[in-house]
Amino acid sequence: MKTTVDKLSDTRVKLTVNVPFAELDKEIDQAYAAIAQQVSIPGFRKGKAPRQLIDARFGRGPILEQVVNDMLPSRYEQAVTENDLKVIGQPEIDIAKLEDNDFVEFTAEVDIRPEFEVPDFSKISVKVPALETSEEDVDKALEDLASRFGELKDTKRKMKTGDYAIIDITTEVDGTKLDEASHEGMTYRIGDDNLIKGLDTALRGMKTDEDNEFTTTIQSGEHEGDEATVKVHVQQSKERKLPDLDDEFAQMASEFDTIDELREDTKTRVEESKKSEQAAAIRDEVLKAALEEVSFELPSSIVDEQVHAQLHQVMGQLAHDEKALAQLLEAQGTTREEFDADARKSAEESVRTQLFLDALAEIEEPEVSQQELTDHILFTAQSYGMDPNQFIQQLQSSNQLGNLFSDVRRGKALATAICRAEVTDEAGNKVDVDQYFGEIDEDEAEASEEK
C-alpha cells in the first residue's frame, strides 16, 4: 500500500491511498463467501458455488463493491497511523480509481489537530480570590436556610425590596394595550427587576389597594425602543416572615439540637463551598492564561459540528419548534443572528480548549483507571438526570463512551500541569494547589479509607 499526504491547510489534509489487489486476498475471499451464502445456484449447495459461476451470474461488480467497503476502514486507519496523523472528526472518502485485478485508489480528506507548542506551566502566574470565611458569610447562609421555612404574610406598611406583591399591570403604547406586557393577579418579588423596567421603583413605597403609573422604554420584542405607559394596581402586599434562629429552628431545619451546633456545621459547609470555588477559579484562571500563550487555527468542520450540536440541544428542549425559538429569542431581546454568533463563539472556545487539552494530555500521559471513568459516567448521568445504566447504553449505542474517557484524560492532564503553576490569592498569599489537584498516593488513600 502506498500513501501520499497533501496538506490542504494547517488543519486539513488529503490522503491518496493506493492499494494493490495482491494485498486484498482476504477481502476478496470474504466477498465471494458472503455472496455465495446469499444466492442459490442450481447444482451447488448454498455457499459452495465457484467464483466463475458467481461472476458469470452476477458480474464482478457486487464483488468489487464488497471488497472496497470491507477494506476502506482498515486501510484508512493504516494510512493515518503510518503517517503519524492526529486526525479529528470523520473523513470524506472518495474512490478515485478502481482497476480490477490491479489496484484500488481512494482519497480521504480529514481534519487534523493543529500543531502548536504547549506553554511551560511553571512560568504561569495567576491570582484567585482569598479563602476567607467571615461571620457575615455564615449569617447569610443561615438566613438562606431560614428563608426556605419563611411564610408570606399580609402587611399594611409601605412595601420595600424583598417584599411580595400581587399586582395587576396594564402596559400601553400610544393607547394600545400590549397583552404580552400586561398581567392580572401576578405575584412579583420587589428587587427581582426582571419584568418591566421601572416596576420595582414604582412598587417601593406602595401599599395594598393603591395605584401607580409610570413611563418606561420597551426593552425587547416588536415594540423595542418605544415609550410605554404602565399602570399598576396592588391587590395585596406581603412580607416574608422568617423563623427566629434559635434552638427550635435548628431542630426543625437540621439534625442538630442547638443553633450553636447548626452554626458550626454551617461554617464548615461555607468553608468547603469556598474551597470548591477557589479550586474552580484556579482551574479557570490557569487554563485561561495557558490558552493566551498559544495561537492556532481551528478546523472549521469541527466548529460547525459543535454549533450544530448546540442548536440541536436547544431545539430539542423546544420540541424542534422554530416558532418557539423565535419567541424565546424575542423574550430575551436577542436576534437570530446574535444567537447564531454566540453559538459559534461558544463552539470555537470549546473546540480550542479541547484541542489544547488533547495536546497537553499527550505530554502529561495521564492514566485513567476504570474507577475514574465509572465515577465520571455516574456524575455525568446524574447531571443529566438519567439512570446510569440507561446512560451507559446510550453512550455505547452512539459510540460516545470514548468521549467521556477523553474528558477524564484531559482533566487529569490539566490537574497535573496546574500543580506547576504559581498561584497566589488576592491577599498575596501562596495557594497550596496540591490540596486541590495533587495526586494522592496509594498509601495515603489506604490510610484515609482505614480512618
From Swiss-Prot:
- Phosphoprotein found in the keyword field: no
Q: GO biological process annotations for this chain's record? A: 'de novo' cotranslational protein folding; cell division; chaperone-mediated protein folding; protein transport; protein unfolding
Single GO cellular component annotation?
A: cytoplasm
Q: Which PROSITE patterns match?
A: FKBP_PPIASE (PS50059)
Q: Does the keyword Chaperone apply?
A: yes
Which Gene Ontology MF annotations are present? Answer: peptidyl-prolyl cis-trans isomerase activity; protein folding chaperone; ribosome binding
User: Which top class of enzyme applies to this chain?
Assistant: isomerase
Location relative to the cell: Cytoplasm
All residue ranges annotated as the PPIase FKBP-type domain in the record: 162-243
Which keywords does the record carry? Answer: Cell cycle, Cell division, Chaperone, Cytoplasm, Isomerase, Rotamase
User: Where are the membrane-spanning stretches?
Assistant: none
Main location (coarse class):
cytoplasm
* Superkingdom of this protein's organism: Bacteria
This enzyme catalyses: [protein]-peptidylproline (omega=180) = [protein]-peptidylproline (omega=0)
Please explain the role this protein plays, according to its UniProt record. Answer: Involved in protein export. Acts as a chaperone by maintaining the newly synthesized protein in an open conformation. Functions as a peptidyl-prolyl cis-trans isomerase.
Please identify the protein, giving its name as recorded. Answer: Trigger factor
Task: Tell me which species this is from.
Answer: Corynebacterium aurimucosum (strain ATCC 700975 / DSM 44827 / CIP 107346 / CN-1) (Corynebacterium nigricans)
